[in-house]
C-alpha cells in the first residue's frame, strides 16, 4: 500500500500539461507541513511562522521557530520509541502529525504522508508533533 499523497499548497506550484506536478525545490517544507496539519492556506501559515520567527529571532523554517509554532498551535512534542521511517509511521498512526526528519518536515494525517514527492517515505524520523 502506498501511503503517500501529493500535496503542495504553495501558490506558485506549477504543473505539466498532463497535470503532473513539476519538481519542487523551494525550501518551504515547514510551511507546507503545517498548512496540511492545520488546514490553513500557505499564506496564512507563512505569516504565522514569520510572526513566531520575530519572537524567536529566527527564520520561519528553522527548528526553534517551527517548534515554538507547533507548541503555540496546540501540538505536543513526542519521542519515538524506536527508529521509524515516515512511511511506517504513517501506516501505524491515525491522526494529525508534523514529523521532523533531517532538514525536512512532513505532515502525516490519517495514515498518509503529504509532500511534494514520495522520496521522504524511507527517511528516518527524529521526532514528531501531534495535534491533540
Briefly describe each language-model feature range.
Residues 53-103, 109-111, 115-118:
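Conserved active-site-adjacent core of cysteine acyl-enzyme catalytic domains
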Residues 1-59, 64-74:
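Active-site nucleophile-adjacent alpha helix/oxyanion-hole segment immediately C-terminal to the catalytic cysteine
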Residues 114-132:
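Noncatalytic regulatory segments and standalone regulatory/sensor domains
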Amino acid at each position: 500500500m502506498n501511503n503517500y499523497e501529493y500535496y503542495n499548497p504553495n501558490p506558485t506550484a506549477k504543473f505539466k500539461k498532463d497535470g503532473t506536478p513539476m519538481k519542487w525545490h523551494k525550501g518551504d517544507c515547514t510551511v507546507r507541513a503545517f498548512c496540511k496539519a492545520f488546514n490553513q492556506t500557505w499564506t496564512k501559515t507563512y505569516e504565522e511562522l514569520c510572526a513566531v520567527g520575530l519572537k524567536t529571532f529566527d527564520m520561519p523554517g528553522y527548528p526553534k521557530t517551527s517548534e515554538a509554532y507547533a507548541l503555540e498551535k496546540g501540538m505536543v512534542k513526542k519521542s519515538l520509541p524506536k527508529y521509524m521511517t515516515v512511511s511506517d509511521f504513517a501506516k501505524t498512526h491515525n491522526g494529525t502529525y508534523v514529523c521532523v526528519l533531517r532538514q525536512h518536515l512532513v505532515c502525516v494525517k490519517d495514515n498518509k504522508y503529504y509532500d511534494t514527492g514520495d522520496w521522504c517515505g524511507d527517511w528516518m524520523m527524529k521526532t514528531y508533533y501531534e495535534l491533540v
